[in-house]
């Protein structure tokens, strides 16, 4: 390994890093998804080089792939997006229905996922990006990269329709992933999010084709329009997210990966929702989500303390016997 700086393409990588740092200062912090290409990214030292954007920008520009790569249930949806937004995608996960370069669906997925920036370099991707000025705003260039701000990609927003709840919930394996990826690839389903749990008055839907060779999918949703709600004062601090709403009782989606460690103050939930975001139902005008320890972590710490204590006691007794 010779390091990034010794690579012939280091000036290109360094310029990209400096450009993204400036973009964050001018247009705000947020997650970025870049076009994948093994040769282009590999020339920087590793295809994973852009994953260091959070490091080089002091956490301002989040790396979509670096944040979620092999670490959460968001992974398959990232790679479905990467395939739509890259001329030569990696497609590392098997069992997914990948699309080729498709910026129509790719940009809509960027919006629904709260991705703030899209970075493209190939002639094919940049050419197609020009067709969607209402979704992608070209804000910077760093040869060969074009940097776009994704329009209407709020991190938190009110839902237009009441969520439906999967009757299966989360039962392990691919019980959530398979029907959720089918939902993710079907634009006709996007108005109604499917949750793994929720209030009793939310409609329940079955999961179809579970025992067949056809991929499992959610049954048709019941569409119940919701009143509009305004979400303001959004503050994302990583393990703490806060925001305000102008009315309570209307579900909002938080486009951050769900995990059981999240808890909500001033709202019901959070409930896991397609593809892998969180839904909360505000009960107060100020809502706070925090990521903290659960009984699993506390149990692990207790076992660790007991284990270390047992080793120390055993070592002390052994020392006394030797001394005697």
Language-model region placement:
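Short beta-strand micro-motifs in enzyme catalytic cores
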Residues: 1, 144-148, 241, 276-279
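Beta-sheet entry/capping signal
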Residues: 29-32, 115-117, 145-147
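Active-site-proximal, structured, solvent-exposed surfaces of multi-pass membrane proteins
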Residues: 205-324
């Amino acid at each position: 390994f010779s390091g990034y700086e010794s690579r012939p393409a280091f000036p290109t990588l360094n310029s990209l890093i400096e450009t993204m740092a400036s973009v964050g200062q001018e247009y705000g912090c947020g997650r970025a998804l870049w076009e994948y290409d093994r040769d282009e990214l590999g020339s920087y030292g590793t295809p994973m080089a852009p994953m260091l954007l959070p490091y080089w920008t002091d956490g301002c520009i989040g790396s979509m792939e670096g944040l979620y790569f092999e670490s959460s249930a968001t992974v398959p949806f990232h790679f479905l997006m990467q395939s739509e937004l890259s001329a030569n995608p990696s497609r590392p996960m098997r069992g997914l229905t990948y699309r080729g370069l498709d910026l129509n669906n790719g940009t809509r997925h960027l919006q629904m996922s709260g991705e703030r920036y899209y970075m493209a370099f190939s002639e094919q991707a940049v050419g197609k990006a020009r067709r969607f000025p209402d979704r992608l705003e070209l804000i910077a260039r760093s040869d060969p990269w074009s940097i776009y701000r994704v329009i209407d990609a709020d991190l938190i927003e009110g839902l237009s329709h009441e969520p439906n709840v999967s009757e299966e919930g989360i039962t392990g394996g691919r019980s959530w992933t398979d029907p959720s990826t089918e939902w993710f690839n079907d634009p006709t389903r996007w108005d109604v999010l499917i949750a793994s749990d929720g209030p009793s008055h939310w409609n329940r839907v079955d999961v179809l084709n579970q025992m067949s060779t056809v991929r499992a999918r959610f049954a048709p949703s019941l569409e119940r329009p919701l009143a509009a709600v305004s979400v303001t004062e959004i503050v994302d601090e990583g393990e703490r997210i806060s925001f305000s709403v102008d009315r309570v009782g209307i579900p909002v989606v938080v486009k951050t990966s769900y995990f059981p460690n999240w808890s909500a103050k001033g709202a019901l939930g959070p409930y896991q929702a397609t593809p892998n975001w969180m839904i909360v139902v505000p009960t107060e005008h100020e809502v706070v989500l925090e990521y903290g320890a659960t009984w699993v972590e506390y149990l692990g710490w207790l076992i660790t303390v007991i284990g270390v204590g047992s080793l120390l006691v055993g070592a002390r007794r052994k020392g006394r016997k030797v001394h005697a």
